[in-house]
Amino acid sequence: VVTDASERPREEKQDPEITKLFNTAVDLLGQKKYDEARVMFEKVLSLNPNASMALTLRNQAKQQAIIDAFMEAPDDTRDTLKKFLSIAERGRRDWLRDQKRIAELVENLTIGNFDKMWAAIYELRTAGQHAVPQLVETLKKTKPDTHSKISMSLMHTGQPVVLPLSEALKVKDSVVKHELVFVLGQIKDSRALPALAALYTGNELPSVKESALEAIKRIIGDGQVKSAPVCYLEEAYAYYQKKFDVLQAPHEDFIIWNWDAETQSLTQRNVPEYAFYLEMAEKLCYEALTIDDSFQSVYPLLICTYFQQLHTIDLHLDEVEKGQTADLTPEDIAGLKARKDRITNILSTTSALGKQHFYAALNLALADGNAAVAVSCESALRQLGSMGDLPVIVGDKKDRKIAVAAAADPLVAALDSDNKQIRYNAAAALAAMAGRSAFRGLDKVIPTLCDALGERGARVALVADSDIQVINQLKVELGEQSFIVDAAADESAALNTGYAVPMKDVLIVDAGFKKAIDRFLTDYRSRKVPVILLVTDANAKETKATYDGKVAAFVAKPVQPADMQAALVEAFKDIKDTSGKAVALGMNYTAAKALANIDVTATALPVQDAIDALAKSLALPDEVRLESMKALTNIGTHFAAAQAVQNDLCMVAGNGANSTSARLASLEALTAIAIKNSGTTDAVKEVAEKLLLDKEAEIRKAAALLIGASASSTGPVMRLLGNANWVGEPVKVGAP
């Protein structure tokens, strides 16, 4: 709510219909008729008032009625009112940042009287970073006696101007540089350190270098003055991790500033919050390389930054696909896709950086606990890594010694990660690299891949309860069922975590968190997500009376595992698929493909130990079982497969409802096993002989090959030759 007249924009000419509806809505708020007020506000919103008009209406409204509504109105009325007020706030922000208004204020600042000057300083502060381009231009064009006024204005604005001012230090004018360095030294914000260090160590006038050093010391105190590339790298890492020192204020726009060397002016690029911190990290890495193109220490962070950007974009696009981000406009979605294309194109060439930097990036991701980035690094190393990277065991069997260090040590360490996806992808990468030599971690690779093949779903659950013991208990019990658990210990955290990406598959909530429960049951993002309420003897009756038929189940505290299991069954009874299942299938596929690609003749890995796990995965969708059957073909060529495995393959081949690709893959695997075993079982022969009459020519051909490899009798082949006319239309007797 605007209270200071000096901050009020000029009033926008109003649309009579919108004005009438808005005034009626506010009157209804004042009368506490909240449902009727909500309907009126919805009509106002349906007429698409622009931001400036909404701002004028807001400023003319009865403020107390709006305040009371936020305290007393039902959630649906509050939500509708918030939508209107967010449009009005956009109008206020647009007005504060209007360049024509800023130009008038800068003029008042530089040539106005004392009162106008201080009024301009105050109002320019509300414009924040948006005022910097004009203030810098004015510094370039005016005489030194006005510079102090501009510097005073910038210092009063403070932290919001640090990023554009740091970029503006690239200006050629040394007088302007002096002023900007002085301002940054007075503000004392660590985000300016890299740019100041670049001046101090760069090819600048001695007076500029001296001013830069003085500003640096004001910021760091007695700390060590570091080189510019190191400063840029440290700042990039701070943005990558979203450390407190680099967080934007809630009211600030997310802008990436650049200096145009040709025009000697600032340029800006507005970005969404999800992109800002990672793109800033990327920019700062390149700033370091601009100063020293041999400074390869930035490469691991740059790799992590790109992988994290792609992961973040994919999460948002996934939510768009599920219809869970209604607040995104078509332009927002187009921006997401454009960013994905850009990052994908860049990542297609990052392999040129060399595998040593991907190992370092993996180390960085593991240290940060960033599973998504670690998995991406492991996937890249699956293509780049080689046997020479492994920590090979040397010496004879009695006195074996391990190489002190090896490039692939981060992958070996990842086999012990608490995160399944990190373990599974590390095993896949090591399987691709393994040769005949034993190496540290070898004994974990195949068992880990077998675990990955056994994944059948990794749903995401929210556990929200004020009792930490309940949270810890459910974390363990749900984790054993392959749930990914996000926890919240109070109602506010429950709401924040409940709507954080990725969206949850089930919400397990303390019955006392009524506000959160009601929100989960009504919000479009969560109303289709099953809710399980944790009740006590004291509130069970009231809770069931209120929420019976609205939630999936009630579970009494203290929670018994059997009760929770029954509740989960009830919660998911009508849900056919989840994003968690997709994650599990990805794990299955990665493991099967890794086993399919192992050179069985040149590996120390006990690949035969994976045969049973591969056989069990034949019930999975084609994307997985095709790779599993390739793996069985690969392994079966060199190791005998059990009868049960062959029976499983026969079931796939003999079922005409399966895809042709799956049936062919199973026959190929059976053929490889038959060649290895110098024959096959009667059950396999029986299936193969039946398939000689299959309607698919490719299936008939593969079945014939299996029979030939089985050293079978010539009977089936003669039958095949005797039915030479079964391809195409039946031949009619007497036909020409």
Where do the model's predicted regions map?
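Short coil/linker segments at helix-helix boundaries
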Residues: 55, 60, 65-70, 227-229, ...
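Alpha4 helix (beta4-alpha4-beta5 surface) of REC/receiver domains from two-component response regulators
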Residues: 515, 537-554
